[in-house]
Swiss-Prot record:
Catalytic reaction list: urea + 2 H2O + H(+) = hydrogencarbonate + 2 NH4(+)
UniProt keyword terms in alphabetical order: Cytoplasm, Hydrolase, Metal-binding, Nickel, Plasmid
Free-text comment on the cofactor: Binds 2 nickel ions per subunit.
UniProt pathway annotation: Nitrogen metabolism; urea degradation; CO(2) and NH(3) from urea (urease route): step 1/1
Quaternary organization: Heterotrimer of UreA (gamma), UreB (beta) and UreC (alpha) subunits. Three heterotrimers associate to form the active enzyme.
Protein name per Swiss-Prot or TrEMBL: Urease subunit alpha
GO biological process: urea catabolic process
E.C. code: 3.5.1.5
Length: 568
């Protein structure tokens, strides 16, 4: 027996299907489902009178050891830079994504490729958007509570360093690296720490790599000279770790051309490429045209608004220990904050020329705002620039959506050498998954799975009669406590440190995983964000940015989506 139902009714019951569109929060962005991997009429649904019962959608004779899923997220709308925008069930086994497709009982349902058994738990994802957990790979680990805010904002992987004067994203020296890896045992997230890359002698750099850093960070506050840049890159090439750089704002040791010569074509992740966060003034942004440079933005300058310029001056003064009574310190701050390059930054993101978004947490940026700032920028660019050429005539924004979600998922993973484990919902990767109510997409995840287990979600009062009793807040789930947090989290370290067995030496319970291939990515590998302008110039007097001769700019916004409707 078959029954026909209209699209609206189907979407209410099982979520959208092929051709349906979903608005992302209160943005101007609409995602259109490109493919539905479920079998219509045989949907997997949990609850009283629903299909996932013994002998119906649940196969009673299949154990976990025989292949039954540990978890199934039913009828999700997936937004992923690699998989696309699809409707499907998501299967989880042993902490990893087991499959994207149709889950259920193959004896009673058609098209089943993932078995639901008595050992399978269910998260009803009908009407929810599923994305890979976000990555923030520019974190100042100043606060031990950062992970709480990261999870509340959809971030499940945190790479960076601390303390470095609180300003430099460096964990300096082997003893401090050891202590941070031990401290991270308390956090139910994936972590990795950058060592100080500023040394003209390779010895101190190698000892940090051997101690367990996942990369090296060059920062102007420690002296980003051509000599330290070259030495750092030589060590990184030998040890297969990434180098992240904050260049010389004051141009004391050389200009952009000198830094470019010191890099000499080797791969490097350039932080806050626009320059307000630091870097050769005023032309660091010209590096987005280099094929070996992997550029990222930090979220305080994204998107450009009426308040951006004024806010940055105060933040620079505080972050870099500058004195407002010293004219040279004020001049330093003012040289970094340029409305013209900030305005160009939004457009370069929309063109796919800037590949990644990060926070610069507690050193001008906000860790919980990586994802909302990304989508605010995407929505602003649609409003000001119109549909991308690839989206013309589709009635949706799929290409733009994939471009922007890649900025905080797959591209940071590729840059850091950890894409084998995180960054997409492809089978075989760690099951770090955020589920979003479409109305709250990009701001407040409804549920976050970490390593295949619930770690954080919207949750009511624990003494309430139901989970929905107010106040509903972002709260820890079982995966965040006890020994579970070790089982669901990875600590990313250098290949040398993993081979040396630092997990046993340091007494670590979380899984220690070596990064791999951090020296090979180029701009061409940045998914949906690989555009390398042939010619990009920053005018040294007006700071206007020109790409292939055309002035690139946008208007500041006075109002944004995903803002005061959602957050006090």
């Amino acid at each position: 027996m078959t029954r026909d139902i209209d699209r609206e009714n189907y979407a209410e019951l099982y979520g959208p299907t092929t051709g349906d569109k979903v608005r992302l929060g209160d943005t101007e962005l609409f995602a259109k489902v490109e493919e539905d991997l479920r079998t219509h009429g045989d949907e997997a649904v949990f609850g009283g009178g629903k299909t996932l019962r013994d002998g119906l959608g649940m196969a009673p004779g299949v154990t976990q050891a025989e292949g039954a899923l540990d978890w199934v997220l039913t009828n999700a709308t997936i937004i992923d830079p690699i998989l696309g925008i699809v409707a499907a069930d998501i299967g989880i086994r042993n902490g990893e994504i087991a499959g994207i497709g149709k889950a259920g009982n193959p004896d009673t349902m058609d098209g089943v490729d993932m078995v639901v058994g008595p050992s399978t738990d269910v998260y009803p994802a009908e009407g929810k958007i599923a994305t890979a957990g976000g990555l923030d790979i520019h974190i100042h680990f100043n606060s031990a509570q950062l992970h709480e805010h990261a999870l509340s904002g959809g971030i499940t992987t945190m790479l960076g360093g601390g303390y470095g004067g609180g300003a430099t994203t460096c964990t300096t020296g082997p003893e401090n690296v050891k202590r941070f890896l031990q401290a991270a045992e308390a956090w139910p997230v994936n972590v990795g720490f950058y060592g100080k890359g500023n040394a003209s002698d390779p010895g101190p750099l190698r000892e940090q790599v051997e101690a367990g850093v996942c990369g090296l960070k060059l920062h102007e506050d420690w002296g980003s000279t051509p000599e330290t840049i070259n030495t750092c890159l030589e060590v990184a090439e030998d040890e297969d770790v990434q180098v992240c750089m904050h260049t010389d704002t004051l141009n004391e040791a050389g200009f952009l051309e000198n830094t470019f010569g010191a890099v000499d074509g080797r791969t490097m992740h350039l932080f806050h490429i626009e320059g307000a966060g630091g870097g050769h003034a005023p032309d660091i942004m010209e590096m987005v045209g280099e094929p070996n440079m992997l550029p990222s933005s930090t979220n305080p300058s994204m998107p450009y608004t009426d308040n951006t310029f004024d806010e940055h001056l105060d933040m620079v003064m505080v972050c870099h220990h500058l004195n407002p009574d010293v004219p040279e310190d004020v001049a330093f701050a003012e040289s970094r904050v340029r409305a013209e390059t900030i305005a160009a930054e939004d457009v370069l993101h929309d063109m796919g020329a800037i590949s990644m978004m990060t926070s610069d947490s507690q050193a001008m940026g906000r860790i919980a705002e990586v994802i909302p700032r990304t989508w605010q920028t995407a929505s602003k660019m649609k409003s000001q620039r119109g549909p991308l050429p690839e989206d013309e005539g589709t009635g949706a924004d799929n290409h733009r959506i994939k471009r922007y979600i890649a900025k905080y998922t797959v591209n940071p993973a590729i840059s850091a050498g950890i894409e084998e484990h995180v960054g997409t919902l492809e089978p075989g990767k760690l099951a770090d998954i955020c589920l979003w109510d479409p109305a709250f997409f990009g701001v407040k995840p409804a549920m976050t799975f970490k390593g295949g287990f619930p770690v954080h979600s919207e949750m009511g009062e624990a003494n309430g009669s139901l989970m929905t009793c107010e106040p509903i807040l972002q709260r820890e789930r079982a995966g965040a406590v006890g020994k579970a947090k070790h089982a669901i989290s990875l600590s990313f370290v250098s290949p040398a440190a993993a081979e040396a067995g630092i997990d046993e030496e340091y007494g670590l319970d979380s899984r220690v995983v070596p990064i791999e291939g951090a020296r090979t990515p180029g701009k061409d590998d940045m998914v949906y964000n690989s555009y390398c302008p042939d010619d990009i110039e920053v005018d040294p007097e007006t700071f206007e940015v020109r790409v292939d001769g055309e002035h690139v700019t946008c208007e500041p916004s006075s109002e944004l989506p995903l803002a005061q409707r959602y957050l006090l």
